[in-house]
């Protein structure tokens, strides 16, 4: 790795969505996601039950901590003192608290990265706005360098392509030519496309690179969104359950499902794919395989370290 000569500590703020670490935190967590809007008892009960079915908590905070620890280990040889901070958008440890801690520690320069490879005004930009608001609230200044996206990084693409192969290999060798791969990501409102948001384009670029590296033909894979919100406005589709039904009508019975927009296990994988999508597949007589999420995969951790190191060199 490049040796950086500036010895002033450089902060590295890792940001993720956040998630409840027990069922008792669900009301507050949902209230934050819904910006204080009242959550009906029916919705609260439904989502609480979803979390109960995946173990009674979100594994995202734990995986985020592990990802940060592994990334910082790789960055230890950069030559410049680095200090990691974790901030969540919708639950503790809050982004605002992380920024306050950075100010208290005397951090003057920092890198901010969201654990989401594709940029959107409704995702990554929201995290960055929280940083700026926290600085204003605390009347402080930190020179932040933002990593907006890393959706085409070779290590990230290779790690996902490896998961395609892992999923296909779950099927008997004589059936693998019949396996169809679904690549998916969290849906967002359709209006972002009209506003020129790059989210969908970046997802499709990632998907094409993954499919090519995995050696898939155009007929062997397709794209789907998942986990659409509950607002009445149109959301990007098709949704995963609808897509499974469409594939079934085409005679496809063996499927590998990989959520390329998520970098760790959480409810949108463990419930939306492992439970909800599996129920649809079972109903249709399909076999659905979901390979492991990236979590602390060395290739993905190497990707995070690489993009952070490059950004650190820019601000040195």
Swiss-Prot record:
Cytoplasm in keyword set:
yes
Amino acids binding Fe cation? 186, 268
What sort of enzyme, by top EC class, is this? lyase
One GO MF term on file is:
ferrochelatase activity
BP terms from Gene Ontology = heme biosynthetic process
Q: Which UniProt keywords apply?
A: Cytoplasm, Heme biosynthesis, Iron, Lyase, Metal-binding, Porphyrin biosynthesis
Chemical reaction(s) catalysed: heme b + 2 H(+) = protoporphyrin IX + Fe(2+)
Cellular compartment(s)? Cytoplasm
Q: What is this protein called?
A: Ferrochelatase
